[in-house]
Amino acid sequence: SGNVAEAPKHYHCSYEDADIVMREWYHVWGSG
């Protein structure tokens, strides 16, 4: 997660990473 360069290599994890990113995004923007 967080490493765009690894996205193509670990594309099968994109959904898991997206879930983590969205949770972090919600935490940052949802609290502001």
Curated annotation (Swiss-Prot):
Keywords, alphabetical: Heme, Iron, Metal-binding, Oxygen transport, Transport
Record-annotated disulphide pairs: none
GO molecular function: metal ion binding; oxygen carrier activity
Lineage top rank: taxon: Eukaryota
Keyword field contains Transmembrane helix: no
Quaternary structure, from the entry: Giant hemoglobin is composed of four heme-containing chains (AI to AIV), and two linker chains (AV and AVI).
Family, similarity comment: Belongs to the globin family.
Name of the featured protein: Giant hemoglobin AIV chain
Natural source organism: Lamellibrachia sp. (Deep-sea giant tube worm)
Organism ancestry: Eukaryota, Metazoa, Spiralia, Lophotrochozoa, Annelida
